[in-house]
A protein has these predicted regions:
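Conserved donor-binding/catalytic core segment of Leloir-type glycosyltransferases
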Residues: 195-212, 218-221, 231
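Nucleotide-activated donor-binding/catalytic signature segment of Leloir-type glycosyltransferases, i.e.
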Residues: 69, 241-266
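Nucleotide-sugar donor phosphate/pyrophosphate-binding loop at the beta->alpha transition
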Residues: 118, 126-145, 158, 184
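Conserved small/polar residues in nucleotide/adenosyl-binding loops
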Residues: 276-278
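N-terminal strand-loop element at the rim of the active site
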Residues: 9-13, 24-87, 156, 161, ...
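Donor nucleotide-sugar binding/catalytic pocket of nucleotide-sugar-dependent glycosyltransferases
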Residues: 144-184
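A short helix/loop element that forms part of the nucleotide-sugar donor recognition site in Leloir-type
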Residues: 181-195, 245
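Glycosyltransferase donor-sugar binding loop
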Residues: 40-43, 205, 229-244, 261
Length: 278
């Protein structure tokens, strides 16, 4: 079978790009013909709160060749994307969806392609973690252009059925990532982080966003005894100042270790192998 994947993928970094790279690889392993259609501009720089959108040294990225054609904020590229995918003539188009910002381009492509192939949307989030008033109507607009859906959690299935009651979908658990750095022992991991392996090390890992409750975790660690240490590892979208103020005021401030930066794929095992709980 011939698959087209429309998604951010290498050289973009982050979970969606990593997932799409793995999906591409596994479909090829199964003997399918696959082509990736990528963004030439994902987020305009003025709207992107992080350091960079692209892989850097230390990232164990799945290097997938792709056609970089879709520009999220340039409607002309929506037509170019349709033409590029149609010329490939796929049996199935898989669209990676996680936020409504991309609906205008995605919905246009899905609408134009649904007469030529099956259009399946793989939904990471039907409704964003920080929802806005326009997220639901935009998501519904896209979903109505699709033949079917893939969801990976009960919550996303629930959201999909509320937004599009007639949706045809399958649900499979989110697969494990297998492209990170080599495994090391706990003592070595703790040594690299400058923490003690005998302590009860807790980890907050990933992008730091308001909705994730890091402020509550910082307050909670101050109520635990000195055996508990907290590691905060991830890039902050927004200012870290309010979290730093909580740390400075905490009785546990000497037991809180901050790595406020994007953690490369190569470094990830160090953090996860140093702890008792996530």
């Amino acid at each position: 079978m011939r698959f087209a994947i429309l998604s951010p993928i290498y050289p973009y970094r982050g979970g969606i790009a990593q997932f799409s790279g793995m999906l591409y690889t596994e479909l090829v392993k199964e003997g399918h013909e696959v082509k990736a259609f990528n963004f030439k501009r994902l987020y305009p720089d003025i709207l992107f709160p992080g350091k960079t959108q692209y892989v850097e040294a230390g990232d164990r990225a799945i290097e997938i060749e792709s056609v970089r054609v879709l520009d999220s904020v340039n409607p002309v590229s929506y037509f170019s994307t349709v033409n590029a995918i149609r010329s490939y003539a796929p049996d199935v188009l898989i669209i990676s969806y996680w936020m409504s910002f991309f609906v205008p381009g995605y919905a246009h492509v899905a609408n134009r392609m649904k007469k030529h192939c099956k259009v399946i949307t793989l939904i990471h989030n039907a409704i964003p973690h920080e929802p806005r008033f326009f997220d639901k109507p935009l998501a519904s607009l896209l979903f109505k252009q699709c033949h079917g859906f893939i969801v990976m959690s009960d919550n996303v299935r629930y959201d999909l059925r509320k937004l599009y009651p007639g949706a045809k979908y399958i649900q499979n658990p989110h697969p494990l990532y297998n492209h990170f750095g080599s495994k090391i022992n706990k003592n070595e991991a703790c040594q690299k982080l400058g923490i003690h392996p005998s302590k009860k090390n807790l980890l907050f890992f990933g992008l730091i966003r308001d909705y994730k409750g890091l402020d509550l975790l910082i307050e909670a660690i101050g109520q635990l005894n000195e055996d508990y240490h907290l590691i905060i590892a991830g890039e902050c979208y927004g200012s870290f100042e309010k979290y730093q103020a909580l740390i400075d005021a905490s009785p546990a401030k000497e037991r809180i270790f901050v790595h406020c930066e994007y953690i490369s794929d190569e470094e990830i095992p160090i953090y996860f192998l140093s702890l008792i709980h996530i």
